[in-house]
Amino acid sequence: MYDMSRAMGHGVGDGKDRYTTADRRAVLRYLNVQRWKDAANGTFVPGGHDIYVDDKGNVSAADRILPETLPANPNPVLKEFFDYYRMPRGFHPRSVNSTGAWNATMPLSFMNMPLLSYASEVTIPTLIVTGEKAHSRYFAEDAFKAIGSKEKALVIVPGANHVDLYDNVAGKIPFATFAQFFKTNLK
């Protein structure tokens, strides 16, 4: 699972948040400048939700979520998403992840709205699933800790990455585990 407000507000790292406080401020400045440019131009610039800050505080963002072609020696997470969204397995011509990007300033809507703020108020049975090798695993583990329900389960799927759990191409989705959780908790 992804906590999208955390992902946009703190950057997605490999098992932890990526932005420092200075990085976060730089991203906010960048997005606010872009918002003014968009207003002045009467149109918006496309962009993804993952914004990069280098060691000197310079901010850069791509004009699309995934590249047209995969670069040599890609980051494993980029390859994972590319192999799903840009290939027949998950491609759709109207999918933002497959072919384009959102409005570049879209992260502003998420950055100051922590989605899990009220997770402790969730008292219904809750099943959270993540892959053992998912770069996003920390989102699921933290969400599980925050959920207020006594009837909750965190399923960490052995050997699975984030995208393995989109469909069952890799044969890793534990449907029997899900069925048992639902039989036990949905009455």
Q: Regions from the language model: what does each represent?
A:
Residues 110-114, 130-141:
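Conserved alpha/beta-hydrolase "acid-adjacent" motif
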Residues 158-187:
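Catalytic active-site module of serine/aspartate enzymes centered on a nucleophile-bearing elbow/loop
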Residues 154-156:
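Conserved beta-strand scaffold positions in the cores of enzyme catalytic domains, especially
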Residues 1-82:
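Alpha/beta-hydrolase-fold enzymes
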